[in-house]
Structures are given as C-alpha cells and as structure tokens.
Design a protein with these regions (language model features):
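Membrane-lumen/periplasm interface segments of multi-pass, membrane-embedded glycan/lipid transferases
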Residues: 145, 158-195, 336, 340-422
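Perimembrane helix-loop-helix junctions
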Residues: 308-344
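Transmembrane-helix motifs of polytopic, lipid-linked glycan transferases
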Residues: 202-229, 262-266, 417-422
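Membrane-interface micro-motifs in multi-pass membrane enzymes
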Residues: 176, 180, 204, 225-269, ...
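Hydrophobic, aromatic-rich transmembrane alpha-helices
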Residues: 103-111, 115, 210-212, 394, ...
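Membrane-interface alpha helices of multi-pass inner-membrane proteins
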Residues: 285-303, 308-314, 345
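Membrane-embedded, lumen/periplasm-facing catalytic core of multi-pass transferases
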Residues: 496-565
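Signature aromatic-anchored transmembrane alpha helix within multi-pass, membrane-resident enzymes
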Residues: 282-288, 411-413, 479-503
C-alpha cells in the first residue's frame, strides 16, 4: 500500500470461498472504501460484514461509507479475511453461460440459413486476396525499412512522462473515461503491460507497413520504386514519434491506423458506383454501416483518426478529379455527401459504443479530452483562431524547425510541388477551382481539432495524425507525373527529406536518452543522501519523502513544445512529488512513499530556510518525513491557497 488512495486487484478461482489479505508488513491503519468481485461487466459488492480480522488486527470499525482497520502495535504481518459472495458469483456465471449459449445458437442458425451467400462471399474474398499476393510480397521490404528508421526505439528503452504511472496501472478503465474504449480492450486483453521495450514499436512498424500497402491500393497505385521511396515520409514522420513517446499509445495507434486504411480502401472502391446507388438502396446502407463500424473502432483507438479519415477521403475524391478533368459535378457532390455520411455514421456508432462502455463499467467522462476543446475562444475570436491555426499548419507543412526542433524543409517542397503540378495540369479554371477547394479541405482537416481548441498550440502535435498522409499524398501526386526532370527533382527532395526525418528521430532519441540518464543519476544521488540521514536504530521498512520545486535539465538537443519528449521527471509540473517518487520506484527505489496534501501543507514552511539542491542541507528530515528542495519556485502541488 502507498499513502493515499490505492486500487488493488487479485485473481481467484471459482471455488474460492475466502481470501486472506495481508495489506502491510508492520503496524498501521487503513480504510476500505469499496470491495467488490468483478466478473465480466458485473460488479458484485462485498458487504462490510463479510470482512473479519485474521491475525494481528487490533480492531475493525465499520462506518456507512467505509471500514477502518487498525493493526496491533507490534504486528509484523497483519491480515484480514474476506468472505466471497459465492451464491451471486455462481448466478453470474450461470447467466453468462446462458447468454453465450444463446449467442452461439444464433450464430449457428445464421450460418446455416446464409450458407450459400457466405460461401460466395468467401470465394470472392479469397480470390481478391490471392490476386493481391504479388502486391503483399513487398511487405517484408516495407517492414525492414520501417525497422531501420525506428531502430533506436526498437533497441532502446526510454520511458517518459506518464509512462511511470502506466507501468503500475492495474485498472485500464481509465481509457474508457477518455473515450478510448478500443484502447481499453487492447490493453485489457492483448497487452496488459504496454510499457515494455521492442514489442510495441515492432507492432507499429508492422502495422504502418500493412497500412501503407492498403493506402497505396486505395489510391489505385502500384507499389513501384517511387512509392517505396515515399514510404519513409509517411511511416517516420515526427507525428508518429511524438505519439510513440508514450508507450501505452503505440498499440492502439497502430491498430487504429490499419482500421482507418481499411475504411479508406472500401470507400475508394465503392466510389466507382456512387452514381448508381439510390438513397434507400440496401447495398448503400450496408456499405455505410461497414465503413462506419470499422472507422468507429479506429476512433475508439485514437479520436484524431476521424479527421485523418476525412483528409484521406477528400484526397481520394481529389485524385479522381485530378485523373479525370471531365468528371461531373454530380459525382463530386455525391462523393462528398457519401464521405460526410460515413463520418457522421462512424461518430454515431463511436459515441453509442462509448456510452455503452461507460454505462457497463460505471466510468464517467474525465476532463482530459474535453479539456482540449475551447469553443468559447472560437466563438469570441473566430478570426484570430483561424489565422493562428493556418499559421501553425503552414509551419508544420513547411517543416519549420520551430515546430520540429530541426528543419524538415524538403517535405514542404514536396507538398508544394504536388499542389502546383496538380493545379497546372488542370484543363480549365472550373477544374482548378474544384481542385483548390478539395486541396484546402484535405490539407486543413488534420487541424480541425486545433480550430476547436482555440488555435495555435492548443492541441498536441501528436494528435495531427492526418499530416503524414497529406504530405505523402501530394508527394505521390508529384512523383507520378511522367516527366523525367520532375521525377529527378522529386527523387532528390525525397532523399533529402528522408535524411531530415532520420535526423529528427536521432535528435529526439538523444534528448530522451540523456534526460532519462540524468534523472536516473539524480534519483540515485538523492536516495543515497536520504539514506545517510536515516538514524542507526531506525526499523522502518519504507520512508516518506516530499520534493519541493524542480530541477530542469537543459541540453543542446531540441525540445518539442507540446510533447513529453525530453521532459524530466524532476521538472514536470514545476516539480511533482508523486511523479518523482513513482519514477524512483520504477528504477528500483521502492521503499519510499509520498505524503498526502494535508501533511504537505503542514511541512511546506520548512522549505523557506532550506538551500536548493545540491547543497548539503537541501535534504532535511522532519519527524519521519524527508524534505528535498530541488528549486526555489513551488510546483503545482505546493501552491496552497491561503485560508
């Protein structure tokens, strides 16, 4: 147990009647607020009357909303007994078995009734996949290229801000509160501990390679040497690195990218019959539902994929117009309406599923996602918000070093070349006007959340997952032109941009690694200094520690404004004792704990007379608490309002 609120889980067999819990090694007092057995979606509350003393327990006091347990003064291994509600558990198991049996029976009945149709569908799908075998033979090559660009992330292990909390997380329902129910499913059933080296990044390398194959196919292109050369721009763009800075995001983002690409493939192929469908056509509604269902899963992985798909969909329509200047306005309008319906239907399915998960698991929405939305700023200053968003978009698409820390100017040349060549090759001004409108929509869609958030830097750069697609798409438009000079210039720009992207990865990896090494060394030195102050007759097995202020780490490598890359655990939030202590536990100093806010308020005055680290007296022992002063300015947790 740590000081503060703890949520603990334990697994047991069906026939278990009692559980013995040994909460602490030594004496102490603790309160239980809630105790329940969780089976699938059901929470069976264990009444306080079913909690009894077992060994070294002085007394148990039961209150309406909690139960207080006090151990004996000389206790070494106190324990309590918890009686499990076996009758209710067996009832839930029986009900679940009946529901599963009903589902299995329904599936078998459906398969038997639709056997011939399903067999035809299976044959068609098998033929399609077989026809694409030559295309997918290049998948190992793409995976190899991806692994080359992500080599440091694959071979290293550099945790950053928030990873320290995720390592100890046992309850993954936090993701449901953020509206990322697909992340909850992936973390709960596939990768319960996502903060590990190699595997998450390797999954991303495979996923981004598969997604790229699907993406190229959705645009009706072949995987020629040109599109292979374009792959690094899509796969290694810094946006992905910013997301991968948090290990817990990687699996969900990888799966979300695949689902988004599959939705785009269906959308692209179905556009050929857009003029033939009627509004009440069953096939039309079925296609809408299938695409909305797949895309809703992608949104459940990472909400920004809705804007990514919107950008991709506009790109597909733009490509159709670029390739066929005689295309009718009716086709364009119907295509845009079709895209709009898919987006709306996917959002409807996403929010319905989100509501269902929150209802089943009893989780309410937290303020993390909603905190990014600032409609008040948009309504009060719409002009300023739009202008600042356009300015930020310009800096990102031109590869400004102010955004990425290093220059990525070559990608800006690729994007501008694609735009200019597409407009130049248009047959008349009407086509150019149509292309220009579609281009603007495609380019600005990844920044829709920035507009809703109130403008520049209101949204982390990692959320702009549509940007790599936009740059790849316009680069592909340029390189597909059958002109030797243009091909040479684009190829040269590609080589330069690939080098610049690899340089960006190298710089980000350097700042992450150096910051982590400094934090580890600082943690070890602080722990050593604490141990020198421990009295010789001390028998405590753990120690209370509080940190005041921050100790920033400044180096020559770039820091990204909205990213945790290079963020120090001793500097975040102006110095956050909970983060610092949790980080120290991760690297092995597991016998230290933080203090609660009440005790922190009582002790904050002692910091006034203490010098700043690394002075000799920058660590002080007050009663049983070690106070560590890292800086002069109080962090968020030491900024108490005067009463």
């Amino acid at each position: 147990l740590q000081i503060g609120e703890n949520k603990l889980t334990a697994h047991f067999l069906l026939q278990t009647k009692f559980i013995r819990w040994d909460p602490v090694n030594g004496s102490g007092e603790f309160n239980i607020k809630a105790l329940y057995v969780k089976i699938l979606f059901f929470d069976i509350i264990i009444p306080y009357d079913d909690i009894a003393a077992n060994f070294d327990i002085e007394c148990i006091v039961k209150y309406p909303n909690e139960i207080s347990i006090l151990t004996s003064d000389e206790s070494l291994d106190p324990s309590i007994l918890i009686k499990l509600p076996q009758g209710k558990i067996l009832s839930i198991y029986l009900l679940t078995s009946l529901i599963l049996a009903a589902i299995i029976f329904t599936v078998i009945l459906f398969l038997s009734e639709n056997h011939r149709k399903l067999k035809k569908l299976h044959t068609r799908l098998s033929t399609k996949i077989y026809d694409e075998r030559a295309f997918f033979k290049k998948l190992p090559l793409l995976i190899s290229i991806a692994c080359l660009f992500w080599i440091f992330s694959l071979t290293g292990y550099s945790i950053s801000i928030d990873d320290e909390l995720a390592i100890f997380r046992q309850d993954h329902s936090l993701w449901i509160g953020q509206g990322r129910w697909a992340v909850f499913l992936l973390t709960e059933f596939i990768l319960p501990q996502p903060i590990i080296p190699f595997l998450p990044h390797f999954i991303f390398c495979v996923s981004v390679s598969v997604s790229y194959l699907i993406l190229v196919r959705a645009h009706g292109m072949e995987l020629s040497w040109k599109n292979i050369a374009l792959f690094p721009i899509f796969m290694a763009f810094p946006t992905w690195y910013f997301i991968a800075g948090f290990y817990a995001n990687i699996l969900a983002v990888s799966m979300g990218l695949i689902f988004t690409s599959i939705t785009l493939l269906i959308f692209s192929h179905s556009l050929s019959k857009i003029n033939e469908w009627k509004i009440l056509d069953k096939t039309f509604f079925l296609l809408i539902f299938i695409q909305a269902f797949i895309l809703s899963i992608a949104i459940g992985c990472y909400q920004s994929y809705i804007f990514c798909f919107l950008s991709m969909g506009l790109g597909i329509i733009l490509l159709k117009v670029d390739q066929n200047s005689s295309i009718s306005n009716r086709y364009i309008i119907r295509s845009l309406g079709y895209l709009f319906l898919i987006v709306c239907a996917s959002l409807l399915l996403y929010y319905s599923t989100d509501f269902t998960f929150k209802f089943i698991y009893g989780v309410s929405s937290n303020t993390y996602i909603s905190g990014f939305i600032n409609l008040e700023a948009l309504l009060k200053f719409p002009g300023d918000v739009i202008v600042s968003t356009l300015h930020e978009a310009k800096q990102i698409y031109l590869g400004s070093s102010k955004i990425f820390g290093v220059s990525l100017g070559a990608i800006g040349c690729l994007l501008l070349t694609g735009v200019i060549l597409s407009l130049y090759s248009a047959s008349n001004w009407k086509v150019r006007a149509t292309l220009l409108i579609l281009m603007f929509g495609c380019i600005i869609s990844p920044f829709a959340l920035t507009i809703l958030g109130g403008g520049t830097r209101s949204i982390p750069y990692r959320s702009m997952v549509g940007v790599p697609y936009v740059i790849w798409f316009f680069s592909a438009l340029a390189i597909e032109r059958k002109n030797t000079v243009i091909t040479f210039l684009i190829t040269t720009s590609l080589i330069i941009s690939s080098f610049q992207i690899m340089n960006a990865h190298s710089n980000y990896s350097a700042v992450k690694q150096l910051t982590l090494e400094r934090d580890k060394a600082l943690a070890a030195e602080i722990y050593y200094r604490i141990t020198t102050l421990i009295p010789g007759n001390d028998k405590l097995s753990s120690y209370k520690v509080d940190f005041f202020g921050s100790k920033p780490f400044n180096n020559i490598f770039p820091r990204i404004a909205t990213s945790t890359i290079g963020g120090s655990f001793f500097d975040w939030d102006g110095g956050n004792p909970d983060r610092i202590v949790t980080f120290m536990k991760v690297i092995g100093f597991d016998n230290i704990n933080t203090i609660d806010s009440g005790q922190r308020r009582e002790l904050v005055g002692f910091y006034d007379e203490m010098p700043v680290w690394p002075s000799v007296d920058s660590i002080k022992m007050v009663d049983t608490v070690f106070l560590v002063k890292l800086g002069e300015r109080p962090g968020l947790m030491h900024q108490f309002k005067e009463q």
